[in-house]
Amino acid sequence: MENLEVMVILFIIVVLGYALCKLGYMGDKFDQKLSSIVIDVTCPALILSSVMGTELPDRSLILPLLGVGFLTYVVLLVFGFWVPRFVSKDRDEQGMIGFALMFANVGFIGYPIVSSIFGPKAVFYAALLNMPNTFFIFTVGVMLVKGVYGVKNLNPKVLLSPAMIAAFAAALLVAFSVHTPDLIARPVTMVGNITVPAALMVIRSSMARLPLREVVGSVKVYVASFLRLFVVPLSVYFLFKVCGVSDLVNQINTVVIAMPVASFGTMFCMKFGRSASLMTEMTFVTTVASILTIPLVTMLLQ
């Protein structure tokens, strides 16, 4: 029931973004500025706030969890760069679909669902498992959205992006068991909490300007959505099960990557001047479909 409530809350925020666009409060220029604020300000705050709670995870689990997290994204690289060529022949669309297959919306949906299934302490483990996401989404993710491939096209400055700096800082706080004073933790958490509603409203606002035919989505959108919500997480689950990863870690990791398409896809499209049509379609369809698929996937893991 809690899983369903989380998904309904998310859907309400998405609908709000649509209404704000239709009423004239949101539009192209506003959405672009808000996207930049989310990427450069509120997202780093959200990352830091994930390690500013009253409890910190067992330090002995940091490296194993980070290792599983990085291996997960190595596996997802195969999905991101190889599978899309079987879904679309268009190079730009392949990049967008690759992003959708690699990156899930963990921040708002993933953590609450992990908490409801495995207990509050599991959120810390989910945060560690998802930490490599920050590195890959701001490197490989940007590469896929921009349609510029190859290591030589990877800008080293991305390692100094606000989100990456926040991820490094968060890792240090956990490694050295630093408990952040409430005077600092509370404002950081408040700013970080802006990320999810802002990102979701931007997604729906951008979709409000699309023709109804595009909102409904094409066959390739539904194929990509099925891969995103079912094939990708279950493939990773069974692979790591064979490799001997503990059941708890494997289950948490699977739930984390079984979420809808990451909202950063639309943010990146707007920031880098790319067409957000396909990305917003996949984000919208997976968000709506996940109301049913997430409970189903979690049941399969029990």
Where do the protein language model's features map onto the residues?
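Alpha-helical transmembrane segments of multi-pass small-molecule/ion transporters
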Residues: M1-Q302
